[in-house]
From Swiss-Prot:
Carboxyltransferase subunit of the 3-methylcrotonyl-CoA carboxylase, an enzyme that catalyzes the conversion of 3-methylcrotonyl-CoA to 3-methylglutaconyl-CoA, a critical step for leucine and isovaleric acid catabolism. Gene3D superfamilies: 2-enoyl-CoA Hydratase, Chain A, domain 1. The gene is MCCC2. Pathway: Amino-acid degradation; L-leucine degradation; (S)-3-hydroxy-3-methylglutaryl-CoA from 3-isovaleryl-CoA: step 2/3. Belongs to the AccD/PCCB family. It comes from Homo sapiens. Probably a dodecamer composed of six biotin-containing alpha subunits (MCCC1) and six beta (MCCC2) subunits. This is Methylcrotonoyl-CoA carboxylase beta chain, mitochondrial.
Length: 563
């Protein structure tokens, strides 16, 4: 009956009551409209977005090959499973693996290709427990740590700490990449921080499990040594602070890697390792048993309802949004294709309407959604602040859908207090302790990025679509600002500034902003947690909210709001 009622209410029905009990019941009006699939605009949008999605999938498949066929063949010849095979054998059969930061290191080091940053990170279910998995890819530079490798691992550990996810380290690395050691070793957020994080998480009862499946040298030896429990593969895994060449150089002693730091030594004599494994398969089997013995049970601070598919196909997002950021679209149409039953209870629908706020569910989890439908005015910012406060009071996780050029500017709006109203929203988002997830579906510019929970505001996860752009402002806007400043300066100096001069000034600025605002530029530097196919959005968000709810929701305290 309810399914029939929901269909009858499509889209956003505002029918007159049929009787005194017309508004009773649990039904919520469905959101969204059926697009004209045959229209020229829809077809053009679909084609452009589909091309970006195809490019995304091609690049992901290339990254999955790691260091290439030769390196993979050498790895296999040593009796090892490939890193992705290790993960497949570790997680529960048929369960998804939410891979993070796939494009870390993409085109970052000029001619040095470091697919995935030489490490695979992501969330998978192991013996029924959602875990953060961090796996070195020894096919990429022997698993050596580049600066971006460290940054990617630190981000994975940050996610694990925020969401209380047990960490499983599949170790197979030669340690720091020495030619870039200055950017790997000495600073606060360099390699040493990974061990600091291990210690802190262990102290907070967030399990740290290491599986030594290859080399574990120098500082890397602390990964298993600092783990709560570890496993080592015989005649394959090694743990030592100094390898055979360094031992010989320092002491003159000649010793094999196995005798210096192999499974027999560490399981029978040193006590550094806890479990001895025959091979990779056996090690992963033992790891699943270790997780089973964590005695962990997920406790939720939210209500759960049965999951329902949206009423509209996910790939319609291609035709609705497209790749041209200058074309507007209603964010409600995006919401309709990611939430359960396409049902959305909008909050303050007629006030501050350039910001859409409301309640929905994704895979049964309650979510408060904040989505952009244009530039932010004072009314929009105050509405957003009010809604964030509501969600914090009710322990409802927040989802931010960013497509924002920023806050409104101009004398009229400054006089009305846009600065203090925008500050309210920024402060509310910063202080919110409920799980926050951000998805950039279009532009992410200027202070709008802050108000909509950009990276600096610690969302538990931040994803980006392949059409999106992130920058302090658009390239043309930046070029116009700098051209105006230059023109005024030349005028004060009594010099000419011709249209040709202006064009010559603007061209490299626009090009630079376009390059640096590209999602691949962002993802290469781990400014986000991954570029995702819009059609996969619902699944990615569902897995992310599920992971985030492993941690208890803390009480939110707000500071002073300037009234």
């Amino acid at each position: 009956m309810w399914a029939v009622l929901r269909l009858a209410l499509r889209p956003c029905a505002r029918a007159s009551p049929a009787g005194p009990r017309a508004y009773h019941g649990d039904s919520v009006a469905s959101l969204g409209t059926q697009p004209d699939l045959g229209s020229a605009l829809y077809q053009e949008n679909y084609k452009q977005m589909k091309a970006l999605v195809n490019q995304l999938h091609e690049r992901v498949e290339h990254i999955k090959l790691g260091g290439g066929e030769k390196a993979r063949a050498l790895h296999i010849s040593r009796g090892k499973l490939l890193p992705r095979e290790r993960i497949d054998n570790l997680i529960d059969p048929g369960s998804p693996f939410l891979e993070l930061s796939q494009f870390a290191g993409y085109q970052l080091y000029d001619n040095e290709e470091v697919p995935g940053g030489g490490i695979i990170t992501g969330i998978g279910r192991v013996s029924g427990v959602e875990c953060m998995i961090i796996a070195n890819d020894a096919t990429v530079k022997g698993g050596a740590y580049y600066p971006v490798t460290v940054k990617k691992q630190l981000r994975a550990q940050e996610i694990a700490m925020q969401n209380r996810l047990p960490c499983i380290y599949l170790v197979d690395s030669g340690g720091a990449y020495l030619p870039r050691q200055a950017d790997v070793f000495p600073d606060r957020d360099h390699f040493g921080r990974t061990f600091y994080n291990q210690a802190i998480m262990s102290s907070k009862n967030i399990a740290q499990i290491a599986v030594v499946m290859g080399s574990c040298t120098a500082g890397g030896a602390y990964v298993p040594a600092m783990a709560d429990e570890n496993i080592i593969v015989r005649k394959q895994g090694t743990i030592f602070l100094a390898g055979p060449p360094l031992v010989k150089a320092a002491t003159g002693e000649e010793v094999s890697a196995e005798d210096l730091g192999g499974a027999d030594l560490h399981c029978r004599k040193s006590g550094v390792s806890d479990h001895w494994a025959l091979d990779d398969h056996h090690a992963l089997h033992l790891t699943r048993k270790v997780v089973r013995n964590l005695n962990y049970q997920k406790k939720l601070d939210v209500t759960i309802e049965p999951s329902e598919e949206p009423l509209f196909p996910a790939d319609e997002l291609y035709g609705i949004v497209g790749a041209n950021l200058k074309r507007s679209f209603d964010v409600r149409e995006v919401i309709a294709r990611i939430v359960d039953g396409s049902r959305f209870t909008e909050f303050k629908a007629f006030y501050g309407d350039t910001l859409v706020t409301g309640f929905a569910r994704i895979f049964g989890y309650p979510v408060g959604i904040v989505g952009n439908n244009g530039v932010l005015f004072s009314e929009s910012a105050k509405k957003g602040t009010h809604f964030v406060q509501l969600c914090c009071q009710r322990n409802i996780p927040l989802l931010f859908l960013q497509n924002i050029t920023g806050f409104m500017v101009g004398r009229e709006y400054e006089a009305e207090g846009i600065a203090k109203d925008g500050a309210k929203m920024v402060a509310a988002v910063a202080c919110a302790q409920v799980p926050k997830i951000t998805l950039i579906i279009g532009g992410s510019y200027g202070a709008g990025n802050y108000g909509m929970c950009g990276r600096a505001y610690s969302p538990r996860f931040l994803y980006i679509w392949p059409n999106a752009r992130i920058s302090v402002m658009g390239g043309e806007q930046a070029a116009n600002v700098l051209a105006t400043i230059t023109k005024d300066q030349r005028a004060r100096e009594g010099k000419q500034f011709s249209s040709a001069d202006e064009a010559a000034l603007k061209e490299p600025i626009i090009k630079k902003f376009e390059e640096e605002g590209n999602p691949y530029y962002s993802s290469a530097r781990v400014w986000d947690d991954g570029i995702i196919d819009p059609a996969d959005t619902r699944l990615v968000l569902g897995l992310s909210f599920s992971a985030a709810l492993n941690a208890p929701i803390e009480k939110t305290d707000f500071g002073i709001f300037r009234m």
